[in-house]
Curated annotation (Swiss-Prot):
This is Large ribosomal subunit protein uL13. Keywords: Ribonucleoprotein, Ribosomal protein. This protein is one of the early assembly proteins of the 50S ribosomal subunit, although it is not seen to bind rRNA by itself. It is important during the early stages of 50S assembly. NCBIfam families: rplM_bact. Transmembrane segments: none annotated. It comes from Nitrosomonas europaea (strain ATCC 19718 / CIP 103999 / KCTC 2705 / NBRC 14298).
Length: 144
């Protein structure tokens, strides 16, 4: 018996739409990262992008548990001495509703060229509409 290895041109990438209304941030991000990597498919190969496209709608209705809305901090740096900025989940979610989910999923994907290709297959929208109707995405229920 030979070991199977998927070839990039043989992989079929499907489109799915996920409704993030009242879903917990980390659990939803873990399920999305799993799908983006393609680990749910029997043809999963670590060095080939076997994942699907995921369209997330209603990202503005995402939630976190406990006191994380005030306690969870996001950091960025300007590159200058003393140029560190911090913001809470609540502030970031109000200003950029899609960014907390994007950062959570990105942190769960591999770092390097393959991970960068995987994150490009994630489309996140704050409202309940998206411009990907032509791809006919299938609804995907994630119990998170």
């Amino acid at each position: 018996m030979k070991t199977f290895s998927a070839k990039p041109h043989e992989v079929r990438h499907e489109w799915f739409v996920v409704d993030a209304t009242d879903k917990v941030l980390g659990r939803l991000a873990a399920a999305i990262a799993h799908r983006l990597r393609g680990k749910h498919k029997p043809i999963y190969t670590p060095h080939v992008d076997t994942g699907d496209y995921i369209v997330v709608i209603n990202a503005d209705k995402l939630r976190v548990t406990g006191n994380k809305a005030e306690d969870k901090k996001y950091y960025r740096h300007s590159g200058y001495p003393g140029g560190i900025y911090e913001t809470t989940f609540k502030k970031m979610h109000e200003r950029f509703p899609t960014r907390p989910l994007e950062k959570a999923v990105k942190g769960m994907l591999p770092k390097g060229p393959l991970g960068y290709a995987m994150i490009k297959k994630l489309k996140i929208y704050a409202g309940d509409t998206h411009p990907h109707a032509a791809q006919q995405p299938q609804p995907l229920e994630i119990n998170a």
